[in-house]
């Protein structure tokens, strides 16, 4: 079968597959002399030949996995195989043992040309005659029908081909050198060995009959791209035994453990905010690694390369092998990580700007970009200041006002705020001029009558121009004491109306006015216009306020 037992088992848990070859779980419902009847959750009962239950006696209620051979054998029965399921599981276990180099148990069941057939838990394997023992054996009959240990030396499940060796087992068990080495090996022991093989993840070291694994992470305290960068087959190395599993005869070795850990007390040698020199060892899309000393590297993240170019690729700032000055930003000794910065070794343009300029100062720059929330103005030091939509015009909405600008335009603005730590400069264009709304509000007399001009009129309200760039709102109820249902029947755009201010909403920049407040009532209830002098312009209001102060 091409699928492993683990794959078939997983599939049996997630889906119901009724095709021949599918693995399903079955429960014994009846045991007969020639067959075993099981319930496998199929349309009909399953039949398993009794011959497949060798060396075991099935009982009603027993559960096990079976393979579907035929969903209908012509008699309304489903033919199942316990043996094929057992073999699928056996193949999976043999594959694990083969990859791990572990021994397996089997029985020599017959002689064939050139060797023997070995039963490895329902899987047949070939044992070459030359691999039966460490020396030639004339009559190996004494080994037949006995469970003994073998080592798999070749395996191909698709071709149903397994080759085993008893000789390899005996050599491992009877090697005097190996036994002696195994007995003397201790964790923490320093020993010499020879590099036997190199892989992507490490190197195998011959310690004298015993092989140990020197993992790539235990070769050096620093970064190792590939074991072949440090070692060659045949090299004699000095290593330390890190871990020794006597039962599985596995040895883990280390080279870097022979030297002091460079990360120990590293904060004393590299205090945070200290500036040091290092060599660029690796460049990635997210930053560059800088070697501070043997076994100690730190990362300069892309955001810490340059003050103004946040998304610049590291390769445009540094080169591999280049010596650079860096500042230690953060140290995590436990995780063996150091965060470094290159830009911190240069003057901060945001801080320089803050030292040279003050709030409310006027500056000039060119529009670099326009966004949904405002526009960025280029300033000295290759930094930007933001003019928010709300700071472009006093009278127009930000969305309308920003249409008057395009990229490259030179504009003048007022500095509203400088925040070097957050790298932000707030600018305003409307602040170049006084706020007509606030100037009007601060100058008007509560009892003053204003001659306003109708700008817009609807049935329930009207918008009036109180002064240049200052508008007020008058509701229908504030127009007159008389019964009026529709302002459009009383007022036209351009009409002048005498009004008084009845409310000012500074937060929402809204002025409510009333014509009714200007009117008076006679004793008979007739309407009269108040004798309060009429002020027609903002200038008149300011002039009157100044005169009242002088008096």
UniProtKB/Swiss-Prot annotation:
What keywords appear on the UniProt entry? Repeat, Ribonucleoprotein, Ribosomal protein, RNA-binding
The S1 motif domain is annotated at 21-83, 101-167, 188-256, 273-343, 360-430, 447-516
Has the keyword Repeat been applied to this entry?
yes
* SMART domains assigned: S1 (SM00316)
Output the Gene Ontology cellular-component terms: cytosolic small ribosomal subunit
Q: Which PROSITE patterns match?
A: S1
- Name the Pfam families for this protein: S1
InterPro entries per the UniProt record, alphabetical: NA-bd_OB-fold, Ribos_protein_bS1-like, Ribosomal_bS1, Ribosomal_protein_S1-like, S1_domain
Please give a single GO biological process term from the UniProt record.
translation
Show the GO MF annotations.
Answer: mRNA binding; structural constituent of ribosome
Please explain the role this protein plays, according to its UniProt record: Binds mRNA; thus facilitating recognition of the initiation point. It is needed to translate mRNA with a short Shine-Dalgarno (SD) purine-rich sequence.
Per its UniProt record, what NCBIfam families does this chain match? PRK06299.1-2, PRK06299.1-4, rpsA
Q: Which family does it belong to?
A: Belongs to the bacterial ribosomal protein bS1 family.
Protein name listed in UniProt? Small ribosomal subunit protein bS1
Q: Which organism is it from?
A: Coxiella burnetii (strain RSA 493 / Nine Mile phase I)
Kindly list the organism's lineage. Bacteria, Pseudomonadati, Pseudomonadota, Gammaproteobacteria, Legionellales
């Amino acid at each position: 079968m091409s699928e492993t037992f683990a794959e078939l088992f997983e599939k049996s848990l997630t889906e119901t597959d009724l095709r021949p070859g599918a693995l399903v779980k079955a429960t014994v419902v009846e045991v007969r002399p020639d067959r075993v009847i099981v319930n496998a959750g199929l349309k009909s009962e399953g039949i398993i030949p009794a011959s497949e239950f060798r060396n075991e006696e099935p009982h009603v209620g027993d559960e096990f996995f079976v393979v579907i051979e035929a969903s209908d054998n012509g008699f309304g029965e489903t033919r199942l195989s316990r043996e094929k399921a057992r073999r699928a599981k056996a193949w999976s276990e043999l594959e694990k043992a083969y990859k791990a180099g572990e021994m397996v148990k089997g029985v020599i069941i017959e002689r064939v040309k050139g060797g023997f057939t070995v039963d490895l838990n329902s899987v047949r394997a070939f044992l070459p005659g030359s691999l039966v023992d460490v020396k030639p054996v004339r009559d190996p009959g004494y080994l037949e029908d006995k469970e003994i240990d073998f080592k798999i030396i070749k395996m191909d499940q698709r071709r149903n081909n397994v080759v085993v060796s008893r000789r390899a087992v005996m050599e491992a068990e009877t090697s005097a050198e190996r036994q002696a080495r195994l007995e003397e090996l201790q964790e923490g022991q320093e020993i010499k060995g020879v590099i036997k093989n190199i892989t992507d993840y490490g190197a195998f070291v011959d310690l004298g009959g015993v092989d140990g694994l020197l993992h790539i992470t235990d070769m050096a305290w620093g970064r190792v791209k590939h074991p072949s960068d440090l070692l060659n087959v045949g090299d004699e190395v000095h290593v330390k035994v890190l871990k020794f599993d006597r039962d599985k005869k596995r040895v883990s070795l280390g080279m870097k453990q022979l030297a002091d850990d460079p990360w120990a007390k590293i904060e004393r040698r590299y205090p945070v905010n200290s500036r040091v020199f290092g060599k660029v060892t690796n460049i990635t899309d997210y930053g560059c690694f800088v070697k501070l000393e043997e076994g100690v590297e730190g990362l300069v993240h892309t955001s810490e390369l340059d003050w103004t170019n946040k998304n610049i690729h590291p390769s445009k700032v540094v080169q591999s092998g280049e010596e650079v000055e860096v500042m230690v930003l953060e140290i995590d000794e436990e995780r063996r990580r150091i965060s470094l910065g290159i830009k911190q070794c240069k003057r901060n343009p945001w801080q320089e700007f803050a030292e040279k300029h003050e709030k409310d100062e006027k500056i000039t720059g060119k529009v670099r970009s326009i966004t949904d929330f405002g526009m960025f103005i280029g300033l000295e030091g290759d930094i930007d200041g933001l003019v928010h939509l709300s700071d472009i015009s006093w009278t127009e909405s930000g969305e309308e006002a920003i249409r008057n600008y395009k990229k490259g335009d030179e504009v003048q603005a007022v500095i509203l705020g400088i925040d070097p730590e957050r790298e932000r400069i707030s600018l305003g264009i409307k602040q170049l001029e006084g706020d007509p709304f606030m100037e009007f509000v601060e100058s008007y007399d509560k009892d003053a009558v204003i001659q306003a001009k109708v700008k817009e009129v609807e049935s329930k309200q009207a918008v009036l121009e109180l002064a240049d760039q200052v508008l007020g709102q008058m509701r229908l109820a504030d127009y007159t004491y008389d019964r009026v249902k529709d302002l459009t029947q009383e007022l036209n755009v351009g009409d002048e109306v005498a009004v008084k201010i009845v409310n000012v909403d500074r937060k929402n920049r809204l002025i409510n006015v009333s014509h009714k407040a200007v009117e008076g009532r006679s004793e008979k209830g007739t309407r009269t216009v108040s004798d309060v002098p009429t002020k027609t312009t903002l200038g008149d209001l300011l002039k009157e306020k100044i005169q009242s102060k002088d008096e």
